[in-house]
From Swiss-Prot:
SUPFAM superfamilies: WD40 repeat-like. It comes from Homo sapiens. InterPro entries: G-protein_beta_WD-40_rep, RACK1-like, WD40/YVTN_repeat-like_dom_sf, WD40_repeat_CS, WD40_repeat_dom_sf, WD40_rpt. The modification Phosphoserine is found at S276, S278, S279. Changing Y140F: No effect on binding to SRC. The modification N-acetylmethionine is found at M1. The 7 WD repeats mediate protein-protein interactions with binding partners. Scaffolding protein involved in the recruitment, assembly and/or regulation of a variety of signaling molecules. Interacts with a wide variety of proteins and plays a role in many cellular processes. Component of the 40S ribosomal subunit involved in translational repression. Involved in the initiation of the ribosome quality control (RQC), a pathway that takes place when a ribosome has stalled during translation, by promoting ubiquitination of a subset of 40S ribosomal subunits. Binds to and stabilizes activated protein kinase C (PKC), increasing PKC-mediated phosphorylation. Changing Y246F: Abolishes binding to SRC. Does not abolish phosphorylation by SRC. Abolishes phosphorylation by SRC. The modification Phosphotyrosine is found at Y52, Y228. WD repeats lie at residues 13-44, 61-91, 103-133, 146-178, 190-220, 231-260, 281-311. This is Small ribosomal subunit protein RACK1. Keywords: Acetylation, Apoptosis, Biological rhythms, Cell cycle, Cell membrane, Cell projection, Cytoplasm, Developmental protein, Gastrulation, Growth regulation, Host-virus interaction, Membrane, Nucleus, Phosphoprotein, Repeat, Ribonucleoprotein, Ribosomal protein, Translation regulation, WD repeat. It holds the Pfam family WD40.
Length: 317
């Protein structure tokens, strides 16, 4: 008897790539998805056989692709970043923008909330990392020892006893920053291509990075060293740790690989069955991943504008 993933359904509603998905333990029947259609959709999960969820509300306001979205820990607010160069804070009860964050000179590629929701970090194509308060005031711009190329992803560690930010960029580097003084703690060197994503484990002890070279590299955040590398075999667009299993999920081109980190083995590989009329048609790429808070459901966003929903099931292999 092994755990495996079963496709449960899809969420249809976007008219552009699904760039990010956010879940919250406060509201297990709600998820948010960001898209290149310039909107964020708030979904009500019905878990019906035919339709896994219905679009309840579209958050509109960005004038270009929405690149990232996260939900505050109380489930009341969402934070988004866009290629229009701004961040927006949304009140999820009303669906309105409560703050616009202006300061980046180019596309915002990534946004994150600190665990206490008091600080916000953003990464941009202007090669800077900015720290903001929730009132929309930029408190600090990291330029010293910053990335020499686009900053593709920024994340806070959830561990409040080790307050750090992890970033990655198109300069192939993973950087760890001390949140107290915004100074560089560690440069993690090893990737051979540009990086798309970095994610921190739920306990804050390690992080994983991935991008063009198809390698998921794992780094020890306490010791500041490289642990091991998992071969994804294709460009890595997104990475996320399971909230309750020692698993790492990677969006590798059109498929999703799930590794058990204890044995460093693949638990499952998720591919969507594409009935293609021409063999030259490229299958949709997986661009975003998010687990439900209970770790039983995996949401995946794709370049065919769909969110596919997979569930952990017990099966016989």
């Amino acid at each position: 008897m092994t755990e495996q993933m079963t496709l449960r359904g899809t969420l249809k509603g976007h008219n552009g790539w699904v760039t990010q998905i956010a879940t919250t333990p406060q509201f297990p029947d709600m998820i948010l998805s960001a898209s290149r259609d310039k909107t964020i959709i708030m979904w009500k999960l019905t878990r019906d056989e035919t339709n896994y969820g219905i679009p309840q509300r579209a958050l509109r306001g960005h004038s270009h692709f929405v690149s990232d979205v996260v939900i505050s820990s109380d489930g009341q607010f969402a934070l988004s970043g866009s290629w229009d160069g701004t961040l927006r804070l949304w009140d999820l009860t009303t669906g309105t923008t409560t703050r616009r964050f202006v300061g980046h000179t180019k596309d915002v590629l990534s946004v994150a909330f600190s665990s206490d929701n008091r600080q916000i970090v953003s990464g941009s194509r202007d090669k800077t990392i900015k720290l903001w308060n929730t009132l929309g005031v930029c408190k600090y711009t990291v330029q010293d020892e910053s990335h020499s190329e686009w900053v593709s992803c920024v994340r806070f560690s959830p561990n409040s006893s080790n307050p750090i930010i992890v970033s990655c960029g198109w300069d192939k580097l993973v950087k760890v920053w001390n949140l107290a003084n915004c100074k560089l703690k560690t440069n993690h060197i090893g990737h051979t291509g540009y990086l798309n994503t970095v994610t921190v484990s739920p306990d804050g002890s390690l992080c994983a990075s991935g991008g063009k070279d198809g390698q998921a590299m794992l780094w020890d955040l306490n010791e500041g060293k490289h642990l091991y590398t998992l071969d994804g075999g294709d460009i890595i667009n997104a990475l996320c740790f399971s909230p309750n299993r020692y698993w790492l999920c990677a969006a590798t081109g059109p498929s999703i690989k799930i590794w058990d980190l204890e044995g460093k083995i693949i638990v499952d590989e998720l591919k969507q069955e594409v009935i293609s009329t021409s063999s030259k048609a490229e299958p949709p790429q997986c661009t975003s991943l998010a687990w439900s808070a209970d770790g039983q459901t995996l949401f995946a966003g794709y370049t065919d504008n769909l969110v596919r929903v997979w569930q952990v099931t017990i099966g016989t292999r």
